[in-house]
Amino acid sequence: MPQSPRPVPSWALLLRLLALLRPPGLGEACSCAPAHPQQHVCHSALAIRAKISSEKVVPASTDPADPQKMIRYEIKQIKMFKGFEKVNDIQYIYTPFDSSLCGVKLEANSQKRYLLTGQILSDGKVFVHLCNYIEPWENLSFLQRESLNHHYHLNCGCQITTCYAVPCTISAPNECLWTDWLLERKLYGYQAQHYVCMKHVDGSCSWYQGRLPLRKEFVDIIQP
């Protein structure tokens, strides 16, 4: 059974950890491990659809000697897909000011809607960065939008393995091979947009393409 996301420490500590983990010589780089949209949703504490109302640069902590800054985005939450048990209506989200610490730049005061995934810090604030799955809503496929309601959450017990080169094989029956990078040289290609890694009644997992009807073994899992 997938574990619930653990509470994340305060943002000042999180910023320091990001700075320490940044590789030497890559002062302006933000490096993230690849993850399928399904993995992002499963590993995040919350997933919401929202509009950005405004932004403001704020101190990362109350310590006057701390030079770190954060961007506080005021948002209008449209729909919550994950995180009900931890937060209700979200008014603000926070991200590092520096792009080298994976800070996210979002368009404020526009009609653009976003899918936002992120962490909930120990003080209750919502923290997002470039290693989360953050996409303009209009860029999501029909399957991705529908899967935010059901399929992604219900199949967090499946493991998705990124395939970079051949040979590339699974090591367990609950794995799905993610081949977008191998075939298209980009992460969010056709497979990320149109497939979900779904669990069968026997515990194994395989890719399900959204435009095809669900097979009985999938239905038995989703509707016991």
Curated annotation (Swiss-Prot):
Xref: CDD domains: NTR_TIMP (cd03585)
UniProt-listed InterPro entries: Netrin_domain, TIMP, TIMP-like_OB-fold, TIMP_C, TIMP_CS
The keyword Mitochondrion belongs to this UniProt entry's keyword annotation: no
Location of the protein in the cell: Secreted
Keywords: Disulfide bond, Metal-binding, Metalloenzyme inhibitor, Metalloprotease inhibitor, Protease inhibitor, Secreted, Signal, Zinc
Signal sequence, renumbered to the chain: 1-29
PROSITE patterns per UniProt: NTR (PS50189), TIMP (PS00288)
Region (Involved in metalloproteinase-binding): 30-33, 99-100
Any one Gene Ontology cellular component term annotated for this protein: extracellular matrix
Disulfide linkage: C30-C102, C32-C131, C42-C156, C158-C205, C163-C168, C176-C197
Alphabetical list of Pfam families matching this protein: TIMP
Claim: Zinc is one of the keywords in the record: yes
Annotated site residues (Involved in metalloproteinase-binding) in this chain: K69
Molecular-function GO term, any one: metal ion binding
NTR domain ranges (all copies): 30-156
Coarse class of the protein's main subcellular location: secreted
Annotated residues for binding of Zn(2+): C30
Biological process (GO), any one: negative regulation of membrane protein ectodomain proteolysis
Similarity remark: Belongs to the protease inhibitor I35 (TIMP) family.
General function of this protein: Complexes with metalloproteinases (such as collagenases) and irreversibly inactivates them by binding to their catalytic zinc cofactor.
Protein name: Metalloproteinase inhibitor 4
Species of origin: Bos taurus (Bovine)
